[in-house]
Amino acid sequence: MHLISYKHFVPNSLNLENLFDSLQNVAWTSHGPIELDDIDKRILLSRKNNESLEIKSVDKFPCLTDYIIPPSVRIGDASRVRLGAYLSEGTTVMHEGFVNFNAGTLGPAMIEGRISAGVVVGRNSDLGGGCSTMGTLSGGNEVKVSIGENCLLGANSGLGIPLGDNCTIEAGLYITAGSKITTYNSNNEPESVVKASELSGCNNLLFIRNSQSGAIEAKINPKSVALNKTLHKN
């Protein structure tokens, strides 16, 4: 995890198979990691000695910032970024953002949503508040989700396919691999209905839900995301 967070290796480049089987749950505290069999005694001892012992979490992974402070990165709530997160310079993780291990950003990015394990986000992309990306830790999902450069995931949206560059998903729209999507040509005319998985990695797409029919539509994206540079001068 240190090698990834120090950015010696990008996410998904190391063999992490059976990692969870090899790690134990540990109490991560202000005095460092403590085995769960010892935590009750340590709590009593700290009270006896009038010492402060803060238990930050009980988990297999500590918070990133307990061990590594990435350069030129802003993190609103350090408890929401695990060790093993890969955060590039210029990344801002707001208070509701979350970054799992073996996941992260490949350039400046605004993170107000969830980056699940195995997910990477391209340069100058924006994950809106409450949005979600599907990881590979549970649920049988073997597709590694990625987000290209200059993309926007609207608030409370979701993504279950790899997204190309310059793509936008409207707020509240969750796209899974099996979602049926109507594609439109450059004349804004409907062409065909395809599974979202067939659009994996395609660039310059705008994903919206038709407010009258409820159908999911993919059109040519007329805009490109531009991050507020002031917010990313970390």
Label each region the model flagged.
Residues 130-202, 209, 214-217:
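C-terminal amphipathic alpha-helical segment
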Residues 1-66, 198-234:
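Terminal amphipathic alpha-helical/low-complexity segments used for targeting or macromolecular assembly
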Residues 65-68, 80:
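A mid-sequence, solvent-exposed acidic-amphipathic segment
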Residues 27, 123, 177-179, 195, ...:
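Alpha-helix boundary/capping detector
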Residues 73, 79-81, 85-87, 91-93, ...:
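A structural motif detector for beta-strand N-caps
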